[in-house]
UniProtKB/Swiss-Prot annotation:
Pathway: Isoprenoid biosynthesis; isopentenyl diphosphate biosynthesis via DXP pathway; isopentenyl diphosphate from 1-deoxy-D-xylulose 5-phosphate: step 2/6. The record marks R20, K27 as: Transition state stabilizer. The record marks R157, K213 as: Positions MEP for the nucleophilic attack. PANTHER family: 2-C-METHYL-D-ERYTHRITOL 4-PHOSPHATE CYTIDYLYLTRANSFERASE, CHLOROPLASTIC. GO terms for molecular function: 2-C-methyl-D-erythritol 4-phosphate cytidylyltransferase activity. The lineage of its organism: Bacteria, Pseudomonadati, Pseudomonadota, Gammaproteobacteria, Enterobacterales. The gene is ispD. It holds the Pfam family IspD. It catalyses: 2-C-methyl-D-erythritol 4-phosphate + CTP + H(+) = 4-CDP-2-C-methyl-D-erythritol + diphosphate. Its EC number is 2.7.7.60. Keywords: Isoprene biosynthesis, Nucleotidyltransferase, Transferase. This is 2-C-methyl-D-erythritol 4-phosphate cytidylyltransferase. The keyword tRNA processing does not apply.
């Protein structure tokens, strides 16, 4: 029988640096308003009553996290992350070995809406595999010629989706798929790709396109706009 309305643990891989932000400070520690991007991302998870624990995987040399209020939050656990995202996620999964379902959320994705999170969590009522938040591709997509800045051809956008986070899976299934994929040298770009590698087909749960990941300098102002708009809407 599929699990129904069980408590959920979350893993946030936050050991990366994000060199495309062109800043000495890791992007998850840049501020939007009076909170860091990481705090916005984690608080969005903790705002849902089913999320009882968040494991944050940080770099072993990270001295910034200890200065945040999150460091003393009773629902937060910190573990050492690895060189790659998958290594950090596996470290987080080890810390929640008894959890049945886990969310994995980007440390630099601060604009998660509660209605999107609720719809993603609801799939645990009927799914044995899990799924991800995703946004349908609306722009015309071009594939470039290998090694060149020239168009090779237009890619049919029907059935193309932008993968977002959180991604939500049974803990044991995700652990086993990540472990197998890494052991066999598969290229893992997100958690869903590990399940795909092992022959599973996670669900696509349509989410809002403003659930952006802060990757480049211009993303910071856009994320601030989205967060400010959400705050104003909640107060209205």
């Amino acid at each position: 029988m599929a699990a129904t309305l069980l408590d959920v643990c979350a893993v946030v891989p936050a050991a990366g640096f994000g060199r495309r932000m062109q800043t000495e400070c890791p992007k998850q520690y840049l501020s939007i308003g009076n909170k860091t991007i990481l705090e916005h991302s984690v608080h969005a998870l903790l705002a849902h009553p089913r999320v009882t624990r968040v494991v944050i995987a940080i770099s072993p040399g990270d001295h910034r996290f200890a200065q945040l209020p999150l460091a003393n939050h009773p629902q937060i656990t910190v573990v050492d992350g690895g060189n790659e995202r998958a290594d950090s996620v596996l470290a987080g999964l080890q810390a929640v070995a008894k959890a049945q379902w886990v969310l994995v959320h980007d440390a630099a994705r601060p604009c998660l809406h509660q209605d999107d999170l609720a719809r993603l969590l609801a799939i645990s009522e009927n799914s044995r595999v899990g799924g991800i938040l995703a946004s349908p591709v609306r722009d015309t997509m071009k594939r470039g010629e290998p090694g060149k800045t020239a168009i090779a051809h237009t890619v049919e956008r029907a059935d193309l989706w932008h993968a977002l986070t959180p991604q939500f899976f049974p803990r044991e299934l995700l652990h086993d798929c990540l472990t197998r994929a890494l052991n066999e040298g598969a290229i893992i770009t997100d958690e869903a790709s590990a399940l795909e590698y092992c022959g599973f087909h996670p669900a696509l749960v349509e989410g809002r396109a403003d659930n952006i990941k802060v990757t480049r300098p211009e993303d910071l102002a856009l994320a601030e706009f989205y967060l400010t708009r959400t705050i104003h809407q909640e107060k209205a």
